[in-house]
């Protein structure tokens, strides 16, 4: 039996950084991968989706460029688009494999299953280690009455735009995945209807900024319906007849589409891992139970990323992987749960920390500052004046509690807010920081000043 200091099961955005960090700290590391290096995010998630979003955004901007004197009628070659998307993925997966090799991490292809607390089996061979990190990720959640297939897509199938753009598309799910893919297909020519069971899209996010995103999407032409569920569908000659119903029951309506995209969430991928043989416990939803050190119920076994707990985000998985690897090497690392979220629509949405509602429930005396992008010179020059930046703070201590953005490049802007929260900054700290002009980042400074009714470029009310 070959033995190692650390075995990492899965090489996604949590697994490969964990393996590299373990090797950096002097551990003998084996990384086991059942599919493709880079995991869901790199191969069939974050990266290919963002590539398609960029292409769709370019098409959208060209169609609207006449306003500043550019007349263009873009013609899209879907096969070339698919090849470009795959090229981006291939370059990055090759880079990850090179990083593993360069850090002397041994890579083994195959499916790993636990044989006991300190042993796994891969391809019929047994491997042992002092520590294990489970980083097996997640898979699309199915929806009753909508089995995945030719007519009902999951998020992975939806990436294959080169196979054709449906004339009419129903997207079930108003979270990040549904919104991003829905807008991609809308901008590439589909008539898109998006439904969400909850009263608003992005139900876990800030309500005000989520409502502004919905308004922007509807203005662009997407049909967004909340408080709605899909009951079932029937395939007929003229398309897929889908029965929709109010979320709380009652009124029903039938719509006809050509394809259905189910994006109602993801579930942890643990089937066949033999967790019970290792003594690893899962919760009622199937997520592996972990503490702040990423330790499971089994000594020496860690779990990270989507398989461990929400939110299911690549950057969260990466940080958790580093924490787990450092603890496997004898350090005392803890996971700080200041995790930003981004939706890469146009306009983008991003948030970190507590929403207004969450802060009030937590007992804070909440104050809010807002700065609209319509007052931002840089936003206007980019043609993206929709949306705002919202700062949530505690009136008594001035402690920064949360920041939410809907507007251009929100995903880039939220990084500064995340750093501020991680450092325990006050709202005044953001306002006192000199920001370059003209930039979108000035809006964060102005929103912080607006909380104290001292913003310069809007009237303080």
From Swiss-Prot:
Pfam families: Pyr_redox_2 (PF07992), Pyr_redox_dim (PF02852). It is found in: Membrane. The keyword Flavoprotein applies. GO terms for biological process: 2-oxoglutarate metabolic process. Its cofactor is FAD. The keyword Transferase does not apply. Keywords: Disulfide bond, FAD, Flavoprotein, Membrane, NAD, Oxidoreductase, Redox-active center. Transmembrane segments: none annotated. Optimum pH is 6.5. Its EC number is 1.8.1.4. One of its GO terms (cellular component) is membrane. Its main location: membrane. Binds 1 FAD per subunit. NAD(+) binds at residues 173-177, 196, 263-266. Optimum temperature is 65 degrees Celsius. It catalyses: N(6)-[(R)-dihydrolipoyl]-L-lysyl-[protein] + NAD(+) = N(6)-[(R)-lipoyl]-L-lysyl-[protein] + NADH + H(+). GO terms for molecular function: dihydrolipoyl dehydrogenase (NADH) activity; flavin adenine dinucleotide binding. FAD binds at residues 33-41, 50, 112, 306, 314. InterPro entries: Class-I_Pyr_Nuc-Dis_Oxidored (IPR050151), FAD/NAD-bd_sf (IPR036188), FAD/NAD-binding_dom (IPR023753), FAD/NAD-linked_Rdtase_dimer_sf (IPR016156), Lipoamide_DH (IPR006258), Pyr_nuc-diS_OxRdtase (IPR001100), Pyr_nucl-diS_OxRdtase_dimer (IPR004099), Pyr_OxRdtase_I_AS (IPR012999). It is a peripheral membrane protein. It comes from the Bacteria. Disulfide bonds join 41-46. The active site is a redox-active disulfide bond. Has chromate reductase activity. Homodimer. This is Dihydrolipoyl dehydrogenase.
């Amino acid at each position: 039996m070959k033995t190692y200091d650390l075995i990492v099961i899965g090489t996604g955005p949590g697994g490969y950084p964990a393996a590299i960090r373990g090797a950096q700290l002097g551990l003998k590391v084996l990384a086991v991968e059942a599919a493709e290096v880079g995991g869901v995010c790199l191969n069939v998630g974050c990266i290919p989706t963002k590539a398609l979003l960029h292409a769709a955004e370019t098409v959208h901007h060209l169609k609207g460029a006449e306003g500043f004197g550019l007349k263009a009628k873009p013609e899209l070659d879907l096969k070339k688009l698919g090849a470009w998307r795959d090229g981006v993925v291939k370059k990055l997966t090759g880079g990850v494999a090179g990083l593993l090799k360069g850090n002397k991490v041994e890579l083994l292809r195959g499916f790993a299953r636990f044989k006991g607390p300190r042993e796994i089996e891969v391809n019929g061979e047994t491997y042992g280690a002092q520590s294990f990190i489970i980083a097996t990720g997640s898979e699309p959640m199915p929806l009753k009455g909508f089995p995945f297939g030719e007519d009902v897509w999951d998020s992975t199938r939806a990436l294959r735009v080169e196979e054709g753009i449906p004339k009419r598309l129903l997207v079930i799910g108003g979270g990040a995945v549904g919104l991003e893919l829905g807008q991609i297909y809308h901008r590439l020519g589909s008539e898109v209807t998006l439904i969400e069971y909850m009263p608003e899209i992005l139900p876990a996010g800030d309500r005000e900024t989520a409502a502004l995103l919905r308004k922007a999407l509807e203005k662009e032409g997407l049909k967004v319906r909340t408080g709605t569920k899909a009951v079932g569908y029937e395939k007929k000659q003229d398309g897929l007849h889908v029965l929709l119903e109010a979320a709380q029951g009652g009124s029903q309506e039938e719509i006809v589409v050509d394809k259905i995209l189910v994006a109602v969430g993801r579930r942890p991928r643990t089937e066949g891992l033999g967790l019970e043989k290792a003594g690893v416990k899962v919760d009622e939803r199937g997520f592996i139970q972990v503490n702040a050190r990423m330790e499971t119920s089994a000594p020496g076994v860690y779990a990270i990323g989507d398989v461990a707990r929400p939110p299911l985000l690549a950057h969260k998985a990466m940080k958790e992987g580093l924490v787990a690897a450092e603890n496997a090497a004898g350090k005392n690392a803890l996971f700080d749960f200041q995790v930003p979220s981004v939706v890469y629509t146009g306009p983008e949405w991003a948030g970190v920390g507590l929403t207004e509602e969450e802060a009030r429930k937590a007992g804070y005396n909440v104050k809010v500052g807002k700065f609209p992008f319509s007052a931002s010179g840089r936003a206007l020059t980019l043609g993206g004046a929709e949306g705002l930046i919202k700062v949530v703070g505690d009136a008594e201590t001035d402690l920064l509690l949360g920041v939410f953005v809907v507007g251009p490049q929100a995903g880039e802007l939220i990084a500064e807010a995340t750093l501020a929260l991680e450092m325990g900054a006050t709202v005044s700290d953001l306002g006192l920081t000199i920001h370059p002009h003209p930039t979108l980042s000035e809006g964060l400074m102005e929103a912080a000043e607006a909380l104290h009714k001292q913003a310069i470029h809007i009237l303080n009310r």
